């Protein structure tokens, strides 16, 4: 049975560290069916002179808020990235109680250099907890695989309230 798509004649790098090889890559759906010469597919993409690689994983992004107004997660989706991880810097939007939306927006405004009004207009606040945030992102969908860490700033504010700005955390 022919593949759905054959990526023909590109230099295939498999991620193992071995040198690339010129080959065809046959796909059925989104699964690689075969790598080799002269493969047959219903559609073909000429990759002569191009690198064919596994999708890249960007382990440090700031898409926490952007995921709501840019499901394509640009520019990562333009560069072969297939999975993004948000929340590395500790400045995230979840978890967040409604009374702290402005504080989280202000933090992002300072860190990301974005206008607070634009952030407020773009963020969909249909969540409070971190699992609710991840569920909302999944339900809305993204062009890339998306995952995130819980940001330190948002977590402190969620647990300690405004005291997060005043004192160190304690076991209490």
Report each predicted region and the residues it spans.
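Residue-level signal for pocket-adjacent positions within structured domains
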Residues: 8, 40, 63, 150, ...
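Structured core elements
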Residues: 6, 26, 58, 85, ...
């Amino acid at each position: 049975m022919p593949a759905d798509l054959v990526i023909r004649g590109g230099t295939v790098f498999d991620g193992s560290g071995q040198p690339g090889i010129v080959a065809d890559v046959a796909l059925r759906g989104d699964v690689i069916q075969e790598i080799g010469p002269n493969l047959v597919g219903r559609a073909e993409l000429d990759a002569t002179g191009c690198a064919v690689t596994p999708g890249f994983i960007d382990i440090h992004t700031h898409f926490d808020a952007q995921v709501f107004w840019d499901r394509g997660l640009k520019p990562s989706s333009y560069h072969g990235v297939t999975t993004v991880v948000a929340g590395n810097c500790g400045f995230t939007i979840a978890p967040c109680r409604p009374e702290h939306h402005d504080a989280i927006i202000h933090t992002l405004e300072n860190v990301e250099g974005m206008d607070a009004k634009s952030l407020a207009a773009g963020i969909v606040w249909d969540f409070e907890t971190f699992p609710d945030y991840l569920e909302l992102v999944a339900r809305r969908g993204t062009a890339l695989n998306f995952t995130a860490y819980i940001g330190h700033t948002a977590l402190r504010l969620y647990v300690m309230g405004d005291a997060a700005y005043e004192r160190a955390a304690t076991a209490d």
